[in-house]
């Protein structure tokens, strides 16, 4: 499709999606006068999908129409916006501003202990993108957008991590390459270590500094790097209704969010067992899952004592790539004999965010995933696993008679999170035993 045809098609799709969103909001009696966003957070999944498609088409239109100077200007605006949000956060300016009232900029400056003239210049810049508002000359109030950064502290934490950690680290990526080369095995020869001039690995620094850990978690949450909720979503799409009264075992990694409680509420006839996997040098869960019917502690790679389950869920991510790949391979080997002895049993493997093939998913989704992948490189010489890499790992677990095989892939729309259905296959047999997840 040539660029002119693309331009027309994308514009038509934007217009159609906008009309459908507007129709939904009117029917749902959404108050359009005081919105933090056009589409409310409780909107149905179908409406959220329309919103996503609209944003994707807007992104494509921007790519088609952007000139080089536009890109430079956009980068300049974003860098200044980040510095302004950091400044407002550092001096707790937003916390000093009432959520539902207007104050003079002079009074806000006195409350915050900052220069009035500088505060006014910063406020008037952020207003241009909808952050804060000036209802009358010299007076400031929250906008729907800025008020969320007060009511949802994780948004402020995410911005502060971006400004204080992620951005300074990213700008040292070239220096790290020049100084260290391709030192992917080192946790300390990183852009992060250059930016902050110390030798502590990033993950160790997070363990030692709760504020850094909190901000890192918030950054992942709001940039699409936290796949724990996505894992729940993709596993909720498995066809559990055909299992009747079967047993389901979930092997849970130290940083994973269990899906068992969610599934147990939806499918009470199933019998769930959670096995908390102890990973060497890894953290452990703060508390057992008291509402789950059965909880076990199991060493990573230890023998799987539950041999009559219909489904085994490996829910090990998120973990650093080296630990994740080793943990997944160890658990696949631990379940090999169980799956070989029971051809009806299936292992469902999830590994958090996976890198897609270039161009294989929506550009907006791919941007988010590759953003996270680069952040891992710069902070810790870490990386995301590729889907094909995970599949090859599964297929490499074998003996002289057969192997583990991926018989189904369940993708979650608009993400790169996937659940792989794995069964034992004897050599010489095709995929005839494959069943839908």
From Swiss-Prot:
Please state where this protein is localized.
Nucleus
Q: In which tissues is it expressed?
A: Specifically expressed in conidia.
- HTH iclR-type domain location: 75-144
UniProt key word Ribosomal protein: no
Q: Which domain of life is it from?
A: Eukaryota
Q: Which GO terms describe its molecular function?
A: DNA binding
The record's InterPro entries line, in alphabetical order, gives: SAM-dependent_MTases_sf, WH-like_DNA-bd_sf, WH_DNA-bd_sf
What Gene Ontology cellular component terms go with this record? Answer: nucleus
One of the GO biological process terms = secondary metabolite biosynthetic process
Q: Knockout consequence?
A: Resulted in loss of trypacidin production.
Main subcellular location: nucleus
Which keywords appear in this protein's UniProt record, sorted alphabetically?
Answer: DNA-binding, Nucleus, Transcription, Transcription regulation
Q: Which residues bind DNA?
A: 105-124
Q: What induces it?
A: Expression is positively regulated by the transcription factors brlA and laeA.
* Free-text function comment from the UniProt entry: Transcriptional coactivator; part of the gene cluster that mediates the biosynthesis of trypacidin, a mycotoxin with antiprotozoal activity and that plays a role in the infection process. With tpcE, coregulates the production of trypacidin.
* Name of the featured protein: Trypacidin cluster transcriptional coactivator tpcD
Q: Which organism is it from?
A: Aspergillus fumigatus (strain ATCC MYA-4609 / CBS 101355 / FGSC A1100 / Af293)
**Gene responsible for this protein:** tpcD
């Amino acid at each position: 499709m040539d660029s002119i045809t693309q331009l027309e098609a994308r514009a038509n799709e934007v217009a159609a999606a906008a009309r459908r969103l507007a129709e939904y909001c009117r029917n749902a009696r959404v108050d359009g006068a005081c919105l933090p966003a056009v589409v409310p957070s409780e909107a149905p999944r179908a409406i959220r999908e329309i919103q996503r498609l609209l944003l994707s088409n807007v992104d494509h239109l921007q790519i088609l129409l952007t000139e080089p100077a536009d890109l430079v200007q956009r980068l300049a605006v974003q860098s200044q916006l980040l510095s302004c949000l950091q400044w407002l956060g550092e001096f707790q300016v937003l916390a000093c501003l009432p959520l539902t009232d207007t104050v003079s900029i002079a009074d806000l400056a006195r409350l915050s202990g900052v220069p009035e003239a500088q505060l006014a210049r910063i406020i008037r810049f952020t207003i241009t993108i909808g952050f804060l508002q000036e209802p009358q000359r010299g007076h400031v109030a929250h906008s729907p957008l800025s008020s969320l950064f007060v009511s949802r502290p994780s948004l402020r934490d995410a911005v502060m991590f971006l400004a204080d950690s992620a951005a300074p680290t990213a700008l040292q990526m070239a220096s790290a390459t020049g100084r260290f080369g391709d030192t992917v095995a080192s946790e300390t020869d990183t852009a992060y270590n250059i930016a902050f001039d110390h030798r502590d690995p990033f993950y160790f620094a997070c363990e030692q500094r709760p504020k850094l850990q909190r901000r890192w978690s918030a950054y992942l949450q709001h940039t699409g790097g936290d796949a724990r909720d996505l894992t729940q979503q993709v596993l909720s799409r498995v066809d559990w209704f055909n299992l009747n009264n079967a047993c389901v075992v979930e092997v849970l990694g130290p940083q994973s969010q269990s899906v068992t409680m969610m599934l147990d509420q939806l499918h009470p006839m199933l019998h769930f067992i959670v096995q908390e996997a102890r990973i060497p040098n890894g953290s452990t869960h703060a508390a057992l899952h008291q509402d789950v019917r059965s909880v076990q502690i199991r060493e990573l790679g230890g023998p799987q004592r539950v041999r009559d389950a219909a489904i085994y869920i490996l829910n090990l991510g998120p973990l650093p790539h080296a630990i994740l790949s080793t943990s997944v391979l160890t658990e696949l080997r631990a379940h090999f004999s169980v799956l070989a002895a029971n051809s009806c049993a299936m292992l469902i493997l999830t590994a958090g965010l996976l890198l897609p093939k270039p161009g294989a998913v929506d550009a907006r989704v791919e941007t988010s995933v590759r953003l996270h992948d680069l952040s891992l490189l710069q902070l810790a010489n870490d990386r995301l696993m590729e889907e094909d890499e995970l599949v090859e790992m599964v297929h490499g677990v074998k003996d002289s008679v057969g192997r583990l095989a991926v018989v189904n892939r369940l993708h979650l729309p608009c993400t790169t999170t996937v659940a792989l259905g794995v069964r034992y296959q004897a050599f010489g047999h095709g995929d005839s035993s494959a069943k839908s997840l």
